[in-house]
């Protein structure tokens, strides 16, 4: 029996946003400046983000515009030594999600520029961003990834800043699967010669396309813009 979970060092690092920042900096990968809240002395210009070191799905996240807001929020937090301050970078219109899958014989990367509505991805377009692809390969290789992780970033000018990495299957797994990025199936099949989940391995990951969420997702492969 196999449980699809990443290695302990990967889970431990990426569930902690402060440790995520440290390891990205050690790899010379751009990431927003990040400081523990109880050590913050306004080293970062406002606006700033306050969030839990361990939060998921955007919970316990506050955008703070000035010192008064900072003090007000600190007064409402319990155990605020468990919180971090992070530089606010870019805009929500320039947010990207990248998934990297790696096993003993393969390494695959896919990136979407996405729009969020109510915490869900309402629009996702495949983008060939070489910087993000390179970052994903560096992270996967240096941490000896065996499985799948999800990387969140924002574009500022010509640069990308990674602000979060999720060491689990992300909510875009269904979208990825429709563009031949079958990280769940690849991971399952990597443990057995019989390839329990049948897919056509000759189908390459799509290089272009987009998904739109209405009542359900609609998928468009290629560069056709007529249906946008």
Give the residues covered by each predicted segment.
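Short, glycine/acidic-enriched loop or turn micro-motifs at the edges of active sites
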Residues: 54, 90, 167
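Phosphate-binding site of ATP-dependent enzymes
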Residues: 65-143, 154-155, 159-161
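Rossmann-like NAD(P)H-binding beta-loop-alpha module
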Residues: 23-84, 93-99
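Peripheral (often C-terminal) accessory segments that flank ATP-dependent C-N-forming ligase machineries
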Residues: 185-228
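Conserved N-proximal alpha/beta basic substrate-recognition cap immediately N-terminal to
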Residues: 1-34
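Conserved metal-phosphate-binding beta-hairpin within the catalytic cores
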Residues: 143-175
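Glycine-rich phosphate/pyrophosphate-binding beta-alpha loops
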Residues: 58, 115-124, 166-180
């Amino acid at each position: 029996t196999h449980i699809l979970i990443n290695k302990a060092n990967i889970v431990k690092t990426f569930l902690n946003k402060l440790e995520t920042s440290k390891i990205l900096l050690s790899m010379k990968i751009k990431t927003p400046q990040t400081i523990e809240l109880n050590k913050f002395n306004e080293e970062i210009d406002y606006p700033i983000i306050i969030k839990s070191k361990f939060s998921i799905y955007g919970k316990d996240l506050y955008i703070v515009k000035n010192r008064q807001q900072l003090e007000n929020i600190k007064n409402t937090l319990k155990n605020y030594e468990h919180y971090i301050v992070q530089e606010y970078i870019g805009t929500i219109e320039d947010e990207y999600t990248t998934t990297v899958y790696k096993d003993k014989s393969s390494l695959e990367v896919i990136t979407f520029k996405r729009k969020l509505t109510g915490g869900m991805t309402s629009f996702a377009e495949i983008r060939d961003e070489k910087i993000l692809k390179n970052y994903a390969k560096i992270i996967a290789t240096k941490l000896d990834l065996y499985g799948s992780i999800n990387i969140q970033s924002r574009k500022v000018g010509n640069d990308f800043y990674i602000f979060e990495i999720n060491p689990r299957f992300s909510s875009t797994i269904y979208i990825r699967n429709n563009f031949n990025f079958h990280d769940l199936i690849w991971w399952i099949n990597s443990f057995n010669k019989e390839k329990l989940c049948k897919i056509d391995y000759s189908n390459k990951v799509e290089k272009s396309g987009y998904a739109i969420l209405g009542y359900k997702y609609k998928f468009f492969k290629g560069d056709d813009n007529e249906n946008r």
